[in-house]
């Protein structure tokens, strides 16, 4: 969502796919340039042209979340009565649009050169049918049900209601495409006529497929799988944060492209329906479907045989590790139980021995005179007194010994029995491969050309300057070492690579430069140093469009990176880092945003670029 591809509008006629810039393209260009407050780059215009030439008949799915600003106001499992009172009217406004939104994603299609006749057909069928069905707001409120229904159930009800319109639309679409084949102008060249006929034939076949019960059931079932998986992923602690951050990232993209919308509609995403449904039928496992969904939605991978096999392996490996952990836990509990039984047996034996010794002493004292008995009694009291003094001394000694705990990064601090000392932040070291980006582009290039990382060699100065914009953000370290860190960054699972244990910290961010805003992730890559300290070896802002294209290391949330080997000795404490004199960088934080403004060293009133790191969405 939010990319140039996502906002190609319908317009103009079916003919004219070879025209330099169609009416539809002009419309899209105008919308995007207004949203970005700038002219589109040549590469972006070329992307629109490429997309305009593609016939796309893929049905979409809806991600059942409702955002309002930086808050999630409705989850898949949220009922109307559970919505915050201050957000109810807003949620009603979103729900009111569900019928039309679901309808458009069910019959979504893009035809090269524009297709106003298809757009008109979509609207005609909807307007003629929508009034027959119940109001989605009333349905969500659950007037007849005390508890109401969940948001995901509401989405499914709307899908089922809209299915009745799909057959009518498919029939009319197929007839219209056939009529247009008969009316292709004779002025077209044989090659143009062939292209037109092939395109219209595909549209006709698509319309006929929409009329089949199998295709309609596949639509509904695919959405049901998505709803169930979203709810399932949300309930898993280890997946919830990465999921909501990805949803929020796409939501931000949508807001930047369409900043003038009052209602923030749920996200629409493309996922191959046939692959989704067939995988569910084959494995019948919500764990596997959740993994497939995460790879497609969170890690920006398509659903193909390879990704499905990867998902199956991942789930099976996870279950194997869980079983091993359970076995180890059972073994630990059994060993603990055996140890406790052994200790209990020793205690019983000790008590029996003590009783026996006391009994023997009493019998011995009876054979002595009264004087001997009195001396034995005094001696026993003295021994008991010494034992009590020993216990008191032992307790005092243990109270004075402080406990030692290790802070993040290997720094050590004392902790008394009264409680942990407050105010301690996180401690990290910064690797030289991160610090190098604060140098000039020329120095960075010389260092990279001499370095061991092949992918960075022989880059042009222009490329280095572009990379410096997204890598020269070492000030982010001020946030990650602060107590506020966990409000902004999510920690991913650990993995092994190059002989080191690694993990990531990820936050949503917006990079502004020259009037352009880019939504993306702020990535912090870390590894465990030889002394146990945490070392930052990777730091960058990754634009969402780059992440989805599978460039530069893939997904922010994926377990992996493109750095093969790290020279562990090349790291330093970042506390002493300062930019050269004359360079000014301002950092501000209001609890919801951590903002870094990079200024012109020759004119500090001029802001060159701004990186804003956003708090994890409020739930």
Curated annotation (Swiss-Prot):
Residues 411-428 have a biased composition (Basic residues). It holds the Pfam family DUF3654. Residues 385-399 have a biased composition (Acidic residues). InterPro entries: DUF3654, UPF0329. Residues 350-428 are annotated as: Disordered. Residues 350-384 have a biased composition (Basic and acidic residues). Belongs to the UPF0329 family. This is UPF0329 protein ECU01_0100/ECU01_1510/ECU08_0030. The lineage of its organism: Eukaryota, Fungi, Fungi incertae sedis, Microsporidia, Unikaryonidae.
């Amino acid at each position: 969502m939010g990319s140039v591809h996502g906002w190609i509008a319908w317009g103009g006629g079916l003919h004219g796919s070879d025209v330099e810039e169609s009416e539809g393209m002009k419309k899209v260009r105008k919308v995007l340039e207004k949203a970005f407050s700038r002219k589109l780059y040549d590469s972006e215009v070329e992307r629109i042209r490429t997309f305009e030439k593609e016939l796309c008949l893929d049905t979409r799915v809806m991600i059942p979340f409702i955002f309002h600003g930086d808050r999630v106001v409705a989850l898949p499992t949220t009922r109307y009565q559970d919505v915050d009172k201050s957000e109810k009217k807003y949620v009603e406004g979103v729900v009111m649009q569900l019928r039309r939104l679901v309808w458009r994603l069910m019959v979504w299609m893009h035809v090269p050169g524009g297709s106003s006749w298809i757009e008109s057909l979509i609207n005609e069928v909807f307007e003629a049918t929508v009034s027959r069905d119940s109001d989605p707001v009333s349905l969500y409120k659950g007037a007849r049900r005390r508890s109401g229904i969940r948001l995901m159930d509401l989405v499914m009800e709307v899908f089922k209601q809209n299915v009745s319109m799909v057959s009518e639309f498919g029939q009319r679409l197929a007839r219209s495409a056939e009529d247009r084949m008969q009316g292709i102008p004779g002025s077209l060249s044989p090659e143009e006529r062939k292209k037109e006929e092939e395109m219209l034939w595909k549209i006709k076949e698509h319309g006929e497929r929409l009329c089949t019960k199998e295709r309609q059931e596949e639509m509904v079932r695919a959405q049901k799988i998505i709803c169930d998986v979203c709810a399932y992923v949300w309930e898993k602690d280890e997946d919830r944060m990465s999921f909501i951050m990805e949803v929020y990232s796409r939501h931000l993209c949508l807001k930047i492209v369409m900043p003038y919308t009052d209602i923030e509609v749920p996200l629409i995403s493309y996922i191959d329906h046939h692959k989704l449904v067939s995988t569910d039928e084959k494995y019948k496992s919500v764990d596997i479907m959740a993994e497939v969904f995460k790879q497609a939605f969170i890690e920006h991978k398509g659903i193909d045989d390879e990704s499905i096999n990867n998902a199956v392996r991942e789930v099976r490996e996870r279950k194997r590790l869980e079983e091993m952990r359970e076995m180890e836990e059972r073994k630990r509990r059994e060993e603990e139980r055996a140890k406790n039984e052994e200790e209990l047996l020793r205690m019983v034996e000790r008590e029996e021995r003590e009783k026996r010794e006391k009994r023997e002493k009493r019998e011995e004292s009876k054979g002595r005179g009264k004087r001997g008995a009195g001396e034995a009694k005094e001696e026993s009291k003295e021994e008991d007194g010494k034992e009590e003094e020993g216990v008191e001394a032992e307790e005092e000694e243990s109270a004075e010994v402080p406990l030692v705990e290790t802070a993040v990064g290997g720094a050590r601090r004392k902790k008394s029995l009264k409680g942990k000392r407050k105010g301690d932040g996180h401690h990290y070291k910064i690797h030289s491969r991160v610090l190098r980006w604060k140098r000039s582009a020329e120095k960075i290039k010389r260092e990279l050309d001499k370095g061991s990382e092949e992918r960075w060699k022989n880059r042009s100065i222009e490329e280095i300057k572009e990379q410096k914009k997204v890598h020269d953000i070492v000030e982010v370290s001020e946030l990650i070492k602060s107590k506020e860190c966990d409000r902004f960054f999510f920690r991913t699972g650990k993995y092994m690579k190059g002989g080191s244990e690694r993990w990531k910290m990820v936050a949503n961010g917006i990079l502004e430069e020259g009037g352009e805003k880019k939504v993306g992730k702020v990535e912090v890559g870390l590894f465990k140093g030889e002394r146990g300290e945490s070392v930052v070896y990777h730091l960058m802002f990754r634009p969402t469009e780059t992440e989805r294209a599978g460039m530069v290391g893939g997904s922010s949330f994926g377990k992996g990176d493109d750095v093969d080997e790290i020279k562990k000795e090349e790291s330093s404490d970042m506390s002493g880092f300062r930019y050269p004199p004359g360079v000014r960088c301002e950092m501000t934080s209001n609890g919801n945003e951590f903002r870094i403004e990079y200024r012109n060293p020759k004119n500090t009133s001029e802001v060159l670029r701004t990186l804003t790191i956003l708090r994890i969405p409020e739930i």
